[in-house]
Amino acid sequence: MSEYIVRALSPDTWDGFAGLAQRHNGVFGGCWCTYFHTMHSEKTFDADDNRSLKRRLVEEGRAHAALVYDGDESVAWCEYGSPEELPNIYHRKQYEEELDVVPDYRITCIFVDRRYRRKGLSAFALQGALDLIAEADGGVVEGYPHDTQGKKKSVLYSGTRTLFERAGFTFVRTKGPGNCVMRRTVP
């Protein structure tokens, strides 16, 4: 097995992030992991625009992710950030109506290179994000994974409830069909 390492997304690691996204056609139709950064009315749905937006956010320090590297190649990421950085979440209206605690951080997207799937890299990337959050003084962290209830699902961009439970998160409540709110405090 390879020896994986985590690096924070930054201008210095942009090329690694971009390489991974490009190998997968910008990810999910050219999203470039920008979906949660913008509200629907602000979206262009254009891969080149999304790439430019993501790069600008990285350069401005407003996009965060734990990048997993195998040697010099980025092979996975876990996106995280404050609710201000990542305002767009699925089932937001329901989420806000039932909000009891405003988190310091959100984990919104986990992506693994197709060549590296089923090797535990989602968990490695999630732990990498939690470690980076701890380095930034921690706080309340929420994730919004799919609650698959043991069923197979082809797209799991925000991880699974089981993945988050194994990382020490607690189930808070459901959020729309098939999704839930998970929470953990990182010291």
Task: Identify the role of each PLM range.
Residues 1-38:
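Conserved N-terminal entry element of GNAT/NAT acetyltransferase domains
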Residues 26-59:
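Aromatic- and Gly/Pro-rich amphipathic surface segment
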Residues 47-67, 83-88, 106:
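A short helix-loop-beta-strand connector motif used in the catalytic cores of GNAT acetyltransferases and
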Residues 69, 73-113, 117, 151-158:
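Conserved acyl-donor/pantetheine-binding loop and adjacent beta-alpha core of acyl/acetyltransferases
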Residues 107-112, 118-134:
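Conserved acetyl-CoA-binding loop-helix of GNAT-fold acetyltransferases
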Residues 126, 133-153:
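Conserved GNAT acetyl-CoA-binding A-motif
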Residues 155-161, 165-168, 172-187:
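C-terminal "cap" of GNAT-fold acetyltransferases
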